[in-house]
Amino acid sequence: MIKPVPKSLFKVDTPRGFFAGILEAGFTIFVLLIAIRFFNAPNYCKAILAAGSSAGLILSPFLMGLWGKSKTPNSIKCGILMASCAFLIFLASSTNQILFFSLLLLMAQICLSQVPSLMIGIYSQIYSKKERGFRFSLNLVLSTLGGMLSSYFLGRYLDLEFADHRIALWTMAFAALFCSLLHFCMPKPLGVPAVVNRLDLFRNIFFIPFKDRLFFRILIAWMILGFGVIMTFPLRIEYLANPNGLNLKNEEIALIAVSNF
């Protein structure tokens, strides 16, 4: 039976949740804010930045299928993805070309979006049913706390006259790199991971929702809600930041976004 010591995972996963919150807040708020106020980005670049996490979720089932026959532990896969995310963010901080900036951060968000589904597998292998909910919810609380604190301090910093937008990107890159190191330190399952048949995985993606009508309706509603959020999020950030809109400070935009969006 695959059952490493859950406490060792909990000790590593707790700080990971905090730094993952910093990274998520950065992608949700600051990449758009930087594109608008520091790059004066065209609309198509804002759309690329806003669609990154959704593109990652769409690709997730197919990437899971490609990795299905790999015996590499999920924690190692997460570590590689987060290291790739950190590298792409660092590259984005070194360019002045807005299209290159947007595409690099799009790829970084795709890498980040694969981690939650892999982490669910880690939790199910290591935590018991009784402790899984509490420890996962604590991770979410710490993630929210990390996002709130980073939004406040980075927002205040970007309001300074000498502010350099690369500091926000370097903070995100450091958070991703630290998460990567923590993933590599996570306990590995003692057994051999089950091999997933790729054909079965792809078949389940398309046919399982139709077998359960309630699940299918919830899935459709969730997708429609997601499309609404994705389409309007860049508009909300733009309205808060635009001189023809509310023209708020970066700190105010960050706090409003992290608390309401």
Q: Which residue ranges define each predicted feature?
A:
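Helix-loop boundary and gating motifs at the non-cytosolic
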Residues: 1-58, 214-256
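Glycine-rich segments within core transmembrane alpha-helices of 12-TM secondary carriers
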Residues: 56-60, 136-152
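Helix-to-loop junctions at the C-terminal end of transmembrane segments
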Residues: 60-73, 158
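Cytoplasmic helix-loop-helix junction between adjacent transmembrane helices
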Residues: 112-141
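C-terminal membrane-cytosol helix-exit motif in multi-pass small-molecule transporters
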Residues: 174-192
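Flexible cytoplasmic inter-helical loops of multi-pass small-molecule transporters
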Residues: 187-204
